Amino acid sequence: MSELSRRTVLISAAAVPLAGCGKNPANAPYVPPPAPGQKLVAAADVPVGSGTIVDGTLVTQPSAGVFKGFIARCTHAGCALSKVIDGAALCPCHSSTFGMDGQVLRGPAMEPLRARAVKVSGTEIVAG
C-alpha cells in the first residue's frame, strides 16, 4: 500500500467540510411570484386551520373564511417549504415549522414567513 502525501491528506481534509456547503437537494429553484389575479387554488381545497403550497405560495385558512398568503420559503436559509401537516408548514432543510399565520412554531428560523397578497375571487383564491 502506498503512503499518502501530505498534500493529498490536506486536500481531502479540506473537502469534507465543504461538502456540506453545497445546495440542499430539497431546496427547489426560485419560483417567481404569481401574477395578480392568477388562480392559485380553489377555496374549498384549503381546509380551515391548514394550508396548501402552490406555485411558491403558501395559501392558508387560519380561521373560517380568512385566507392568507405567504412566500413558501423558510426565513432561516431560504429552502422551499415542502408540505403542510397538522396545521404547520414544514421546511425540509433544518426542520423549521411555521403556523398558518406565518409565525415560527419551531426554529432554527427566527423570522415569520413573508406575506404574499392573496384574495378570494368567487370560489377561487387568486394572487392579489
Residue ranges: model-predicted function:
Residues 1-21:
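N-terminal export leaders
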Residues 14-17, 22-86, 112-128:
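N-terminal pre-ligand scaffold of iron-sulfur
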Residues 88-95, 105-113:
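Short cysteine/histidine-rich metal-coordination sites, predominantly Zn2+-binding motifs
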Residues 102:
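Conserved catalytic-core motifs of eukaryotic protein kinase domains, centered on the activation segment
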